[in-house]
């Protein structure tokens, strides 16, 4: 037998906000310097030419141009040219 009554509603009611990660600019899109290309944890995507990486692995455009995704084996690089 239960020694406590159901604690349903008093223990529920928490939910965290989504972290909004993912690709923000897709292949072929025009970007300007400073635009965020990808928000990620770890290097799922690697920075290529014209792309910088922040402390939290965010990839951003260093130059104006078009986004290009490039595969080298398992490694996916993002270039802006």
Swiss-Prot record:
NCBIfam families in the record: L27
Gene giving rise to this polypeptide: rpmA
Keyword Ribosomal protein: yes
Gene Ontology MF terms: structural constituent of ribosome
Cited PANTHER family: LARGE RIBOSOMAL SUBUNIT PROTEIN BL27M, RIBOSOMAL PROTEIN L27
Keywords of this entry: Ribonucleoprotein, Ribosomal protein
Species the sequence originates in: Rhodopirellula baltica (strain DSM 10527 / NCIMB 13988 / SH1)
Gene Ontology BP terms: translation
Entry superkingdom: Bacteria
Disulfide bridge positions per record: none
Ribonucleoprotein found in the keyword field: yes
Annotated region (Disordered), positions in chain: 1-22
Family: Belongs to the bacterial ribosomal protein bL27 family.
GO cellular component, one term: cytosolic large ribosomal subunit
Name of this chain's protein: Large ribosomal subunit protein bL27
Top-level taxonomy: Bacteria, Pseudomonadati, Planctomycetota, Planctomycetia, Pirellulales
């Amino acid at each position: 037998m239960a020694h406590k009554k159901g604690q349903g509603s008093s223990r529920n009611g928490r939910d965290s906000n989504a972290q909004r990660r993912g690709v923000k600019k897709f292949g072929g899109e025009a970007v300007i310097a400073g635009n965020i290309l990808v928000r990620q944890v770890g290097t799922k995507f690697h920075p290529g030419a014209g792309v910088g990486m922040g402390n939290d692995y965010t990839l951003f455009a260093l130059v104006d141009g078009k986004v290009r995704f490039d595969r080298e084996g398992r490694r996916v690089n993002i270039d802006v040219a």
